[in-house]
Amino acid sequence: MSENQKCPVSTDLTQNIEEMEFYFHDCADIKKKQMKLGRNQDTACYLTFIEVSVDMGTSALGETLKYLNGLTRDEILCTLQENALGISDATYFPTIEEAVSGLLTGEAILFVDGFDRAVKIPDDGYPNMGITEVDSEKVIRGSNEGFCDSVKQNAALIRKRIRSPRVKVRGLKAGIRSNTNVYLVYVEDLANPGLVKEIEKRLQDFKIDGILDSGMLEQLAEKKWYSPFPQFQTTQRPDRAAMAVLEGRVIVMCDNSPIGLILPTDYNSFIRTSDDYYSRFEIATFGRILRYLASFFAMTLPGFYLAVTNFHTQILPTTLLLSFAEARQGVPFPAVVEVLIMELSFELLREAGVRLPGAMGNTIGIVGGLIIGQAAVEANLVSPIVVIVISFTALCSFAIPNEEFATAFRILKFFFIAVCAWLGYFGMLLGLLAVLTHLSHLTSFGIPYLMPFVGADLNDYEDERDFIWRQPLRKLRRRPVYANPKERTKLTFSKKR
């Protein structure tokens, strides 16, 4: 039967199962059980629920099944007809569509052969057990829930935000010995089928003993594995993952990992944050512009400083040039050695801060940086201006929302230090040209990394209102072109505005 028509629950259990399968095919997170109930085990039934949302052993569902198992078939049907289950919140649905909606609220749905209604047996719904707060993707406004190590729990967190039967959770296995559960989450009528097939093919193209984290999947499935720029977007936020799914993208989640992989992705996706869409467009645009500038300076600022001080001092105002010269008096090293000393010190502090326990790690990063910088200046190992430049560069890298994306700029920073120390501004231009050329040839599952500036026609570009600037939410009426969704329109109003 068409999904747009109301389908009554039938007394024929087989027909009800077929109708539920129409909605929940390719849903590895939906538990479907056919069983026999009754004292004589002669009453066929079909039970379905989101796996992590119901505990059959201790919940109301378990008590209900135990009660029905003590009755005869006629008594079971009579009990259901008279609504005498003894559960105050039990709901009876006359149509399949209502049963589908009830299932997506996190409750269990029971069909009994010979009974023309579906029974929703109340439970705790979507639980909070095991859900952690996100540390790596802090937002000013929005949910604090984060993914955990259970792939089933993570899929339920996405379903909690998108209660549609069109959300599919395709289950795969990875690792010959580990046999790790991998889920592909997408919206059936939005995600491009070719994209889903390509992702599934890439994930099955290799054989390995074990997959212990989603990072291993990421490295094995990337085509241009040598690039410092990630071709998979990572997230620990269920709301970020749900937002990507609604754009027509696909989420890859791996058991024992709290990190979801978003595909395809592009440069701009790494700059956006979840609260860009929860805040007013003026605030979101300002923050986004800062992050774009931060990504540029995190890569080029130390190299720019070396180019100015070593090759192009004539472009500086005289007073500023004298200030630079005075600051470097007594420093025994050339400028490039100064910069490398401070950069490596900051990177070492950052690494130490990550490895140490929470509060201690933060203390090492902040206090250690201040102490080392001050001591280095007082010992005439580096000039104060270098400490300022390196500190500002570190701040810029912290402003980039995605850690893997920020790491790419941290690596390229040393490339720019080398070419600028050797060739000055000419080296800076060559470096920028090399990075831009690399980015223009980089793709994520066939989607250009610099979309829509590369690989899109003018109409696609005009449709996009969500890049460096974020236009008012009411104007963001089309899904991004880079995901190539089946349906582009995502927002309509009843009256023209």
Where are these regions (language model features)?
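Membrane-embedded alpha-helical signal segments
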Residues: 1-300, 314, 318, 438-497
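Generic detector of multi-pass transmembrane helix bundles and their immediately adjacent loops
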Residues: 304, 317-497
